[in-house]
């Protein structure tokens, strides 16, 4: 559950961050700039606060449309996106500023569409930044507890919630197993990032 959920949420988060960063740098309008600033506020808000806000919004949607979205994986993924969009945004924004600025201006002057500029110029130049952004979001999601604990579907367990449940029951030795799995799952990308940074230096 943890790996699959983290991978899907990371991919969607990175895609949204890429579109936001590109739009801000390509179109340079106040509305797009404001949307970017608004989108990355989630990282400064506690996960429990975001979860309660989403639960309130879900209640309104449930009553208005007569559908049930509370306690679904879609809700949980949306919460992860709101919470960790800033992580991916920062990585991609710095990568685009470093690698793509002059190429975007050149493509605009040559009449290339925004779609062409994004996928034929920016994405190839941002491969490393995209990968790093995905890894950072993946690591954060793997260890996120408040959001997952409040918004998870019934009988849906992740490594973080399993660790919490066992620790809450005072089963400390048993809780060390999922906790160790979290460490093992995130240590590979962390080591890779450290080596990447050292190589860059």
Task: Spell out what each predicted region is.
Residues 14, 18, 48, 52, ...:
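Membrane-embedded alpha-helical segments of multi-pass transporters/permeases
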Residues 1-9, 39-42, 115, 119-132, ...:
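Alpha-helical transmembrane segments of multi-pass membrane proteins
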């Amino acid at each position: 559950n943890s790996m699959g959920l983290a991978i899907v949420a990371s991919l969607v988060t990175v895609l949204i961050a890429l579109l936001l960063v590109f739009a801000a740098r390509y179109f340079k309008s106040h509305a797009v700039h404001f949307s970017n600033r608004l989108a990355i506020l989630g990282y400064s808000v506690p996960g429990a606060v975001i979860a309660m806000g989403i639960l309130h919004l879900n209640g309104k949607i449930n009553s208005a449309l007569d559908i049930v979205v509370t306690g679904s994986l879609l809700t949980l993924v949306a919460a992860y996106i709101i919470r960790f969009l800033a992580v991916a945004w920062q990585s991609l924004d710095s990568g685009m500023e470093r690698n793509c600025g002059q190429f975007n201006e050149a493509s605009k002057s040559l009449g290339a569409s925004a779609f062409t500029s994004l996928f034929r110029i920016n994405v190839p130049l941002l491969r490393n930044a995209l990968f790093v952004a995905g890894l950072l979001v993946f690591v954060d999601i793997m260890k996120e507890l408040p959001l997952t604990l409040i918004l998870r579907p019934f009988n849906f367990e992740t490594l973080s919630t399993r660790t919490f449940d066992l620790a809450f029951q005072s089963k400390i030795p048993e809780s060390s197993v999922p906790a160790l799995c979290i460490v093992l799952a995130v240590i590979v990308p962390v080591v890779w990032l450290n080596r990447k940074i050292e190589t860059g230096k």
